[in-house]
Amino acid sequence: MAMAAAAAVASQGLLATSSQQQKKSSAKLICNAATFFSGKRLLWVKSCNNGAVGLRASGVRCEAQAIEREAVKADAGNSREEDAFSGLKQVCAVLGTQWGDEGKGKLVDILAQRFDVVARCQGGANAGHTIYNDKGEKFALHLVPSGILNEKTTCVVGNGVVIHLPGFFKEIDNLESKGVNTNGRLLVSDRAHLLFNLHQEVDGLREAELAGQMIGTTKRGIGPCYASKAIRNGIRVSDLRHLDTFREKLDILYRDAAARFKDFEYSSDEVNAEMEKYVKYAERLEPYIVDTVDYVNAAIAEGKRILIEGGQATMLDIDFGTYPFVTSSNPSVGGICTGLGVAPNRLGDIVGVAKAYTSRVGSGPYPTELFGEEGDELRKAGFEWGTTTGRPRRCGWLDIVALNFVCTINGFTAINLTKLDVLSGLPEVKLGIAYKTPSGEKLRAFPADLSILEQVEVEYEILEGWKEDITKVRSYDELPAAAQRYVERIEELIGLPCQYIGVGPGRDALIVKQ
């Protein structure tokens, strides 16, 4: 029905190209495509580039409305952002589309002002989010959800997260030293698994064992902790309430590590010292511990708005990423259901966050990677050093093949394109639009076989660059024409709107594209 409605609009000539006179008095379309809704987004309809027509959808009925330039300017800024954000469903998720470091934290921080609960569903301290408050103060978070800066938001660390308590408390102390109150606003799942220092030590031993085939782990102990969970000798947050059996479970972890790695040595004194720490940790963590599955689902039933913050990104997903150069959890949409206990039919909007180019920390295939001076320039322009590790990130052009793959898996309803400003000043920009084998065969989909992925030749589409500094731009129609063409070409190739466009690190450096 939505398609028929759109066709009816088009047949009436409402999407016709404007005359030269109309161009002077009318605004360039805020978006070169219109989105129609009937409960969910069903259709992405291209419209002309220079028309002065906006489309509104109510159910499956569409209405065309001329948009005058002055009216667009009057509606720019906060009112336009409010309209875009208020349209989000009750349960909304923000997920990474690449290899992490896309800038998810910033969008979550902005959206959190409009949601009652912000929840993390997977990963651990290997996921780093850098956000800024209204004063411009920088916060690097690893376990605490990004919504913590919004004082009316409750933050949830779900059952799918692995928690290193020393690091968790350090984040809390840092937040409170800067005036951020976490009391009653930060909840930790009683089902979440605890990550111990021994997991971090084992992580390093495992990497050393692999020698030349290192995965490039952050050495934060994430993989070993999830391994403990999988073989069912992990220790959960709820175990802190049973200290009489805690020591025995801790002993098992140490014995298993020593049996697996000859270089892992420990003494009973070391285990005793660790036990003493966790007796204190148990007391401090107790006020934060709740059954988050019950809490989140009760909040949904009460009509509260839930925002889910994914850590890392789909190209690092243990099932769908470039295995084995991946993380140990599911940073894709499935991880929301298993990591929070939220049913699939409860999920509404799912926003995928993608850089206007790509970056990756650590080892693994990376088809569009730039080497030498080109890669160095992009790294410097984007300040591409890992939030968690401090390691320089590998940088390259936007990979449309990989992006289409993750869009299919996650069912994104919109894209947040970040760091568009980093590409300013380049004479040309490229999009990796297809993979070919050395024999010239074009691949239909993103390959699972790394031996194929490592040999693919990328087919690029070259677009004109732009010289202008766009960090002060807050309206889409004020972007340089070349920047708009770049955004719109991405939309055409992935079949989704780039509804949010980042043009700088600050909270306000965001264009909401209607």
Curated annotation (Swiss-Prot):
The active site is at D101 (proton acceptor), H129 (proton donor). Pathway: Purine metabolism; AMP biosynthesis via de novo pathway; AMP from IMP: step 1/2. Residues 1-56 form a transit peptide. GTP binds at residues 100-106, 128-130, 393, 419-421, 502-504. IMP binds at D101, E102, G103, K104, N126, A127, G128, H129, T218, R232, Q312, T327, R391. Mg(2+) binds at D101, G128. GO terms for biological process: 'de novo' AMP biosynthetic process; IMP metabolic process. It is an enzyme of class 6 (ligase). Keywords: Chloroplast, GTP-binding, Ligase, Magnesium, Metal-binding, Nucleotide-binding, Plastid, Purine biosynthesis, Transit peptide. Its cofactor is Mg(2+). Substrate binds at T387, T388, T389, G390, R391, P392, R393. It is found in: Plastid, Chloroplast. The keyword Repeat does not apply. InterPro entries: Adenylosuccin_syn_GTP-bd (IPR018220), Adenylosuccin_syn_Lys_AS (IPR033128), Adenylosuccinate_synth_dom1 (IPR042109), Adenylosuccinate_synth_dom2 (IPR042110), Adenylosuccinate_synth_dom3 (IPR042111), Adenylosuccinate_synthetase (IPR001114), P-loop_NTPase (IPR027417). Binds 1 Mg(2+) ion per subunit. Gene3D superfamilies: Adenylosuccinate Synthetase, subunit A, domain 1, Adenylosuccinate Synthetase, subunit A, domain 2, Adenylosuccinate Synthetase, subunit A, domain 3. It catalyses: IMP + L-aspartate + GTP = N(6)-(1,2-dicarboxyethyl)-AMP + GDP + phosphate + 2 H(+). The keyword Cytoplasm does not apply. Plays an important role in the de novo pathway and in the salvage pathway of purine nucleotide biosynthesis. Catalyzes the first committed step in the biosynthesis of AMP from IMP. This is Adenylosuccinate synthetase 2, chloroplastic. The lineage of its organism: Eukaryota, Viridiplantae, Streptophyta, Embryophyta, Bryophyta.
